[in-house]
């Protein structure tokens, strides 16, 4: 397993080394489905790129204060099967939160996670979970540096629109826990965004 040889920026044992099986490992949670369909992957990618272009064109009016300034170096993301594989391995653990070591040979990797639950027997569409990350833009103050914003409130948004990020790959699992129907989405991004001394994108 080559992932066992990767030295991550943040240290730790690589997720794809620690968990080699692609089967869910969810203890007392009842797994209903895991993995994303081809259509869901396309929808997630399109949602990311539509939002990045909305920001780039200066059409995002939300913020603290809004609007967000337009960008001059915002490119579309492409889907990475490798990033998606590592994201799926992590999602399969049913542990909400970030794993420690998910980098790949060519670059460090960032991550967004989202979890929704319903007592009705239905699961949110993955695009709805991606939109939860976009909604954090309402708390972003573009008049301040990235590092001066409250990272806990805006970190998913900033990773989504980080201009130097080129690829995304996601994994998903749906399970039942104490009568709650939960959908857990993990997206990995490379190269990673959210470096404290940098900015999200170059403004026009």
Curated annotation (Swiss-Prot):
Broad class of the protein's primary localization: secreted
A GO cellular component annotation in the UniProt record: extracellular region
Entry-linked InterPro entries: Allrgn_V5/Tpx1_CS, CAP_dom, CAP_sf, CRISP-related, V5_allergen-like
Keywords annotated in UniProt: Allergen, Disulfide bond, Secreted
Tissue specificity note: Expressed by the venom gland.
Pfam family, one: CAP
Disulfides per UniProt: 4-17, 8-101, 26-94, 170-187
Listed SUPFAM superfamilies: PR-1-like
Residue ranges of domain SCP in the record: 45-189
The keyword Iron is assigned to this record: no
Subcellular location: Secreted
Keyword check for Disulfide bond: yes
Similarity comment text for this entry: Belongs to the CRISP family. Venom allergen 5-like subfamily.
Name recorded for this polypeptide: Venom allergen 5
Organism in which the protein naturally occurs: Vespula germanica
